[in-house]
UniProtKB/Swiss-Prot annotation:
Low complexity bias locations: 98-110
Taxonomy, superkingdom: Eukaryota
Region (Disordered): 1-39, 90-112
Protein name: Putative uncharacterized protein DDB_G0271526
Lineage of the species this protein comes from: Eukaryota, Amoebozoa, Evosea, Eumycetozoa, Dictyostelia
Length: 172
């Protein structure tokens, strides 16, 4: 009988150990998920500011997924805005752009939105970039050099709760 009792105790201990191992595995998995999530958040935040600073000094094509915009926003799908520091911002745009390859038919424009034009864009709740904001949130100031260009295409980032994509133009 002693052997049977020990057998049962061993089984119980093994079951408990297995349960503990499962709990540990779950804990480790959750911890890893949290770590990955935190790393992604840090990466996305860094990417967001880096791209915003780049865009502040670079003519860039940009697409805003209008599904993430306010429905009251006067900037509609299939409108194109040509934005320059020295020009007024055409907030109504021009019906000349229609991306037939994108089901969302996103809006497209060319941005160098620092200064007076930025203020106009902010009033329209558009994606705008402030060099000051980027400087406050970025340790590296070298990204403001106008001689630096990046050519990564289709990079997505969040800015003012909007999902955006950009493609850097050749700055010649």
């Amino acid at each position: 009988m002693a052997k049977v009792s020990n057998y049962n105790n061993n089984n119980n201990n093994n079951n408990n150990n297995n349960n503990n191992n499962n709990n540990n595995n779950n804990y480790n998995q959750n911890s890893n998920n949290n770590i990955n999530s935190n790393n992604n958040d840090k990466f996305n935040n860094r990417l967001k500011c880096l791209n915003c600073c780049r865009l502040g000094h670079t003519k860039a094509n940009w697409w805003i997924n209008n599904n993430n915009n306010n429905k009251d926003n006067s900037y509609n799908n299939n409108k194109i805005n040509n934005i320059r520091d020295e020009e007024d911002v055409d907030l109504n745009g021009d019906d000349t752009f229609n991306d037939s390859n994108n089901d969302n038919s996103p809006s497209r424009g060319s941005i160098n939105a620092i200064g007076e034009n930025q203020e106009k864009l902010e009033k329209q709740n558009q994606m705008v970039i402030s060099e000051k904001d980027c400087q406050e949130n970025t340790s590296s100031k070298s990204i403001f050099s106008s001689n630096i260009s990046i050519y990564r295409k289709g990079v997505k980032f969040i800015w003012n709760d909007k999902l955006c994509e950009y493609e850097i133009n050749d700055k010649t």
